[in-house]
Amino acid sequence: MRYFLQLQVVNMPEQELEFRGINRKHLGMYFEELGGKQITDDFPYIYKSNEWCGEIVREEELSITSTFKVNSVYIRFNASDDMTLKELIKNYRVKTRRIGG
C-alpha cells in the first residue's frame, strides 16, 4: 500500500542546488541534523521543519571519465522567508563541506 502526501508551498522562497559525490542518505541525515523530520520514503524525499522544507528531488550518475563516475543529487530548499532560506542553505553547506588533505 502506498500513501501519497501532497505538500502545498505557497509563496515561499526557494532555491535548488546540486551536490556531487555525497551519499544521498547522508544528505537526508543533514536535514534531520538541522531539525527537519523526514516526511516521505521515496523521491522526492521531503524533510520538513516549522520554518523550512527540503526536498531531495533526484539522483543521477555522472561519468567524469569512462571509469570514474560520481553521483549528482539535486536538492530544493524552501523556507518561510528569505533570511531563513539563506540560513538553512548556509548551515546545510557547512555539513556538505569536504576538506581534502
Model-predicted regions and their roles:
Residues 63-101:
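C-terminal basic regulatory modules in eukaryotic proteins
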Residues 4, 8-20, 24-65:
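Ser/Thr-rich, low-complexity intrinsically disordered terminal regions
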